[in-house]
Amino acid sequence: MVELKVVVSDPKTGRAYNVDASTGAAGAVVGKKIGDEVDAGPLGLAGYKILITGGSDQTGTPARKSLPGAGRRKLLLAEGVGFHPVMEGERKRKMIRAHQITPEFVQVNARVTAYGEKTLDELFPKVEGAEKKEKTKERKVRK
């Protein structure tokens, strides 16, 4: 059973929305590649088209567009997705997932390329009580 979390970003507003895709809905994304445009109707976004921009598997291994295939490989990386060097010229061998979306993926990142009739705010209403709580630290004061 394939369960994916599809994170859909709206470039107009800058907001991101989470879509939980179970077996049937995940079929719209599984088998596609990073950079493919997909109809988002099966994900509950009627009329929308999304562009797959990335993702990661259950171990947190990121997917890289430049790596063809469907598996995981160790690559010597100097920059880009999966590695951010600290020093100039630094390289490191890192585990990277290939660009084809498989059932091992847990999260798929996408952005909207074509909009439907309803806005994303209408499709994903705000949940009451989901506001960010202000973090306050109680200080111990000596008396």
Swiss-Prot record:
| Gene from which this protein is expressed | rps6e
- Which family does this protein fall into? Belongs to the eukaryotic ribosomal protein eS6 family.
GO cellular-component term (any): ribonucleoprotein complex
Q: What is this protein called?
A: Small ribosomal subunit protein eS6
Q: Which organism is it from?
A: Methanoregula boonei (strain DSM 21154 / JCM 14090 / 6A8)
> What is this organism's lineage?
Archaea, Methanobacteriati, Methanobacteriota, Stenosarchaea group, Methanomicrobia
User: Which residues does UniProt assign to the signal peptide?
Assistant: none
Q: Which Pfam families match?
A: Ribosomal_S6e
Cite the InterPro entries for this sequence.
Ribosomal_eS6 (IPR001377), Ribosomal_eS6_arc (IPR020924)
Q: Which UniProt keywords apply?
A: Ribonucleoprotein, Ribosomal protein
Gene Ontology process terms (BP): translation
> Can you provide one Gene Ontology molecular function annotated for this UniProt record?
structural constituent of ribosome
The keyword Ribonucleoprotein appears for this protein: yes
Highest taxon, organism lineage: Archaea
